[in-house]
């Protein structure tokens, strides 16, 4: 249920916040064993938070902006006193000693924490199949994946097991599962939201953002979690506009760029292409000006990303050695042996694969050939975006080349799964804001996502365009 629907129930006193929260936990108990979107729930704490909001309502006090909204948190974001595992054996049982800035802002705004959601181990994946806690199912078809790495967050929203969820996006990990699950997923500008308390995968790419039922809900959450944070030196010290107030503006004469290279890629599914092009026509009918633009290096993004991201991951994950915290092997005969075995046993196959790729790319004799060249291509991709934004206000692409695939489809060919990020990674490489919104369905009844990309700190433009599209299209009127 979206925020506005919940607020109506609360304000008209058709239900107390405590009753609504209890109802959600009953639904989690009945539905989540099949979906497996949650790693753990925080019912006692959520009930206490709900009772506090009910007291404010009873006393007719001013309510914080997200008062009573039930929200789930991806389990690579620290929540004080609650398990933060990154869905890995390496951190299984680890309890965070502090609260992330983003989640702390949510609770200060009145949001209620329901629990921690499943993900690909250490956020490395596109299917939520690599979690030590088991595979998450897509609520639209439980034989299929929800996408990744924020698959648990997207699945929980789509299945009505929370009103909204927080995820992280390194190469598409919010937008791709949002597309697969038929919900809204927003990756803000790099630095718009503090990364303090986000377990690092690739520090120059990671960004926290919302997964919601509606664009307006995403706008509300973004406003609540954005802003300068002295604990994160990469967090931007820029004013945060009220994104919700800026919705509903006319998009007449808005210049939308259609990236030519995206629609010509041989890996793009025909049904996805046709659905997104129908979305383009809808924007045109709403008054937007459609302009074809070229980003010659857009399709080089995937190769660039899979050099830079593993390189940063190999450095970030070096801290997990079994000494101060995390999994420790009992079989090591000395410190070096213990560290080696702890990492071999604690990390799954995909995490080990990416660590090895990154270590190789950074190694002496290969850094110039791979990592430094990838950084040069990254700059060229950013330059392509700069040129495009001189002609248009926002850019439009499909979110993913395909709809949700079957579980196990890429078990024997994990590298092919990397192509799921084909259309999402360029925005991360350039640090740009991007949003995925539902635009239709394929013949199997699976959701298709449309992606809008904005210039730096221009979330308001993509949110407004997405909101106008959402109202006009009414793609998903009733949630599962």
From Swiss-Prot:
PROSITE patterns referenced in this protein's UniProt entry, alphabetically: AMIDASES
GO terms assigned for molecular function: ATP binding; glutaminyl-tRNA synthase (glutamine-hydrolyzing) activity
Any single GO BP term: translation
Keywords of this entry: ATP-binding, Ligase, Nucleotide-binding, Protein biosynthesis
Pfam families with a match to the protein in the record: Amidase
Catalysed transformations (reactions): L-glutamyl-tRNA(Gln) + L-glutamine + ATP + H2O = L-glutaminyl-tRNA(Gln) + L-glutamate + ADP + phosphate + H(+)
Entry EC number(s): 6.3.5.7
Cellular component GO terms, alphabetical: glutamyl-tRNA(Gln) amidotransferase complex
InterPro entries assigned to the protein according to its UniProt record, in alphabetical order: Amidase (IPR000120), Amidase_CS (IPR020556), Amidase_dom (IPR023631), AS_sf (IPR036928), GatA (IPR004412)
Keyword presence, Ligase: yes
Annotated SUPFAM superfamilies: Amidase signature (AS) enzymes
Enzyme active site: 74, 149, 173
HAMAP family referenced in this protein's UniProt entry, alphabetically: GatA (MF_00120)
Family stated for the protein in its record: Belongs to the amidase family. GatA subfamily.
Subunit structure: Heterotrimer of A, B and C subunits.
Alphabetical list of PANTHER family matching this protein: GLUTAMYL-TRNA(GLN) AMIDOTRANSFERASE SUBUNIT A (PTHR11895:SF151), TRANSAMIDASE (PTHR11895)
UniProt protein name: Glutamyl-tRNA(Gln) amidotransferase subunit A
Organism: Prochlorococcus marinus (strain MIT 9312)
Biological classification of the source: Bacteria, Bacillati, Cyanobacteriota, Cyanophyceae, Synechococcales
